[in-house]
């Protein structure tokens, strides 16, 4: 029986064969930001330290990819949020700041205009000259 770490490594090796552009020799020069889905969690959430969303029981996929030389980061957006709210939260997390959902949106859906504060940007130098892969 293979360990979770062995299964993770095998899965990633198969992925490199199927997607050669994702291999270290063909990697993008930009950071890759992983954004979890509904009911998920990211690196800023306490649960991530115990059970990383990207890998779960198999281990920390992003930690493995970073150790292989990739620049991978895990965003933390609302676990049950609209696409609008998640986009606002992701932008605030990428750039550093507080999620601003807008006055009209907040009034229409009956929630606060401002959400989570992200004092430290996930990608400090993100901009036109430094894009990210999502």
Please identify what each model-predicted range represents.
Residues 2-134:
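N-terminal non-catalytic accessory region
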